[in-house]
Design a protein with these regions (language model features):
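Peptidoglycan-targeting cell-wall enzymes and recognition modules
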Residues: 2-26, 54-165
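Second-shell loop/turn segments in exported
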Residues: 10-21, 35-39, 48, 116, ...
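Basic/polar, cationic surfaces and motifs that engage anionic cell-wall
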Residues: 183-220
Length: 249
């Protein structure tokens, strides 16, 4: 695949403007190869992808989950697994592998704390694929084993492939086409954490890529019925404590 497979003129200088890293050209070449395979191929879709993935990965810098927590942080962030479980956090202070094997044990199809699955299947890629279950599903799509996928998602192509797999599985292109930054954020994050930063990068990306952003209008007089979608639906879902509040009824 190449830049010709995009439905707009995706030039090198655009990637340099959007990815403020010395290896921006490597990311550009990987994007030209991977993104069109998943139909992330219009200015609106690429802008949303770059904005959301850039936010989630610290500007395409973080491809592996950082679990280097202090004992104090463990008791604060993960009280269920430490303080409330009467587990001495001091024994896990700044030991990422031990921490992962506790907080990810016996869920997401992972084995128990002794299995090593928590560390093996910790967050990886720009959207932090996590858990044996998710690695297995992604690996099946890519025709590889979960163990191979663990290493693959920590490469540029693998990070993009895994993010695009998540993107496709969660129907995010429709939010891109509707220019619905709020809906896309909720689908990815489960809420609106970091929305201002995501929107700032999205507007910048739209400007660089030549997209025309228009804030979606919310019709508060509409009747919500099965098949309805959009910001109003998401608001109602939040008020009814329906999770995820993805704007789809």
């Amino acid at each position: 695949m190449a830049k010709e497979h995009f439905k707009f003129n995706f030039e090198e200088w655009m990637a340099e403007e959007l990815i403020h890293r010395e290896d921006w050209k490597d990311w550009y070449e990987a994007m030209c190869e991977i993104l069109p395979l998943w139909e992330v191929n219009t200015a609106e879709r690429v802008a949303m992808f770059v904005a959301q993935c850039g936010h989630e990965s610290g500007g395409f810098r973080v491809l592996s989950e950082n679990l280097n927590y202090s004992a104090k942080a463990l008791n604060t962030i993960f009280p269920k697994y430490f303080r409330r479980a009467n587990r001495d956090a001091n024994e896990y202070h700044r030991q990422p592998e031990k921490i992962a094997n506790v907080i990810y044990a016996s869920r997401m199809d992972n084995g128990d704390t002794d299995s090593g699955d928590g560390w093996r299947f910790r967050g990886g890629g720009i959207l932090q694929l996590t858990g044996r279950y998710n690695y297995t599903k992604f690996a099946e799509e890519m025709d590889m084993t979960p163990e191979v996928a663990v290493d693959y998602v920590r490469t540029k192509k693998g990070a993009l492939d895994s993010a695009c797999w998540f993107w496709d599985s969660n129907g995010l292109n429709k939010y891109c086409d509707a220019m619905d930054i709020v809906g896309a954020t909720k689908r990815i994050n489960g809420g609106t954490i970091g929305l201002d930063d995501r929107k700032k990068h999205y507007l910048h990306a739209m400007d660089v890529l030549g997209g025309d952003f228009e804030e979606p209008e919310v019709d508060y007089n509409q009747t919500i019925r099965q098949g309805s979608r959009g910001p109003l639906v998401a608001e109602v879902q939040e008020k009814l404590d329906i999770s995820p509040a993805d704007g789809i009824f």
